[in-house]
Amino acid sequence: MSRKSTGAFLVILLLSMAAGGAVGAADDPYGAARAKMVREIEEDARRTSERIGKTALDPRVMEIMARVPRHEFVPAAERAYAYENRPLPIGYGQTISQPYIVAVMTDLLKVGSESTVLEVGTGSGYQAAILAEFVRSVYSIEIIEALAETAAERLKRLGYDNVRVRTGDGYHGWKEHAPFDGIVVTAAAGHIPPPLLDQLKPGGRMIIPVGGPFFVQQLMLVEKDEQGRTRTRQILPVAFVPLTGGH
């Protein structure tokens, strides 16, 4: 898709969202806030275009970011801030990621309707919901049992039947359902976990923040070619909660 056609799509998307907010505010009180969030994501994409390698994210990603109800994935006390372009606390020392980062990570995976994706770090379930709009199946692992249970119930209530959540140490992946077309890790690891590399399908992509909690973390893109060789590329400096577990 050309840059011109991408821009036209986004203009239409934002205008339709604004109209929906004006006409159906009673039905969707968050419509205007979601439209503002989408604009801010686009602004961040332009600002970081040299790092992410593009001036605009996939229009499919933006359409889904505009549609998935982020307010359903944050605690009641944080709902007034649900569509601000920043992370929010969800309890147990964890956060729901900044919408811009969620959009970039989803875009970089380059997954499709037949893809199977592994998510390490379910958290609130928001990233899993975004992915579920694109792919056939999402397998999500959360080490904190209470978060895993709440996220699973929430995703089921919202109709995301193609997401499966379990409690466990995501460092080791989910071997029973490997290999995966894409892997997204939503907590920072000190290194790229070898089990996740093993479970990435040839031709697949993994997006993972790497670095310690007291050092600069880098969002890394890992690509595995058809011969099983991997290459990595730094995308952005980021700040994620640490990946926990027995590794």
Swiss-Prot record:
Q: Name one GO cellular component term.
A: cytoplasm
* InterPro entries, alphabetized: PCMT, SAM-dependent_MTases_sf
Primary subcellular site in the record, as a coarse category: cytoplasm
The catalysed reaction is:
[protein]-L-isoaspartate + S-adenosyl-L-methionine = [protein]-L-isoaspartate alpha-methyl ester + S-adenosyl-L-homocysteine
- Gene Ontology annotations of biological process type: methylation; protein modification process; protein repair
Which residues of this protein are catalytic?
Answer: 97
- Tell me where on the tree of life, at the top rank, the source sits: Bacteria
Give UniProt keywords alphabetically: Cytoplasm, Methyltransferase, S-adenosyl-L-methionine, Transferase
Can you tell me where the transmembrane regions are? none
* Pfam families (alphabetical): PCMT
**EC number(s) given by UniProt:** 2.1.1.77
Q: Which GO terms describe its molecular function?
A: protein-L-isoaspartate (D-aspartate) O-methyltransferase activity
Q: Which cellular compartments is it found in?
A: Cytoplasm
Q: Family, per the entry? A: Belongs to the methyltransferase superfamily. L-isoaspartyl/D-aspartyl protein methyltransferase family.
HAMAP family reported for this sequence = PIMT
Q: What does this protein do?
A: Catalyzes the methyl esterification of L-isoaspartyl residues in peptides and proteins that result from spontaneous decomposition of normal L-aspartyl and L-asparaginyl residues. It plays a role in the repair and/or degradation of damaged proteins.
Identify this protein by name.
Protein-L-isoaspartate O-methyltransferase 2
What species is this protein from?
Syntrophobacter fumaroxidans (strain DSM 10017 / MPOB)
The gene designation is pcm2
